[in-house]
Amino acid sequence: MKILNLYSGIGGNRSLWGENHEVTAVEIDEKISKIYSYKFPKDKVIVGDAHQYLLENFNKFDFIWSSPPCQTHSRLNFANQLGGKYENRIKYPSMSLYEEIILLQQHHAKNKWVIENVIPYYTPLIQPSFSICRHYFWSSDFILSAQF
C-alpha cells in the first residue's frame, strides 16, 4: 500500500503500520525529519509543507494520514488566550484542518484516509467520524483497529 504520512514528526503512529508499505512522510522541520529517517530508513522523507504537498499529491496514495498542527484549535490554547500569559494574543483557528477534510472527502473518497486533531474549544465545523480520548478523527469509511 502507498501511504502518505503528513506532519510526520518523529514517527509516532508510523510504528504501528509495519514495514510492508511504501511510506512517504512529510515534515517541515529538517532536524525532526532526520530523526524520522533514522527510525524509518526505508521511508521516503520530504522536508516541506505538508498542507501543500497534500494538495499537489493526494491522488498518488492509497492511504493518507494527516495530523495537522493543533495549537490554534486546542482548549488549553484558548484558555491561555483568555486569561493566561498570552492574554490579548487571540488567534484565528487554522482552517487548514477543514481544508484537508473537505479535499479528501470530495476528491479522495474512493481511497482510505484519516485526519486527526485535538477536540477543539469550539463546536467542530465538520462532525468527526469518531473520537478517542482527547482527539477527533475524520476519515473515509475506514475503521482503525482496536490496537490504535
Segments predicted by a language model, with ranges:
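Conserved active-site and SAM-binding loop architecture
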Residues: M1-F148
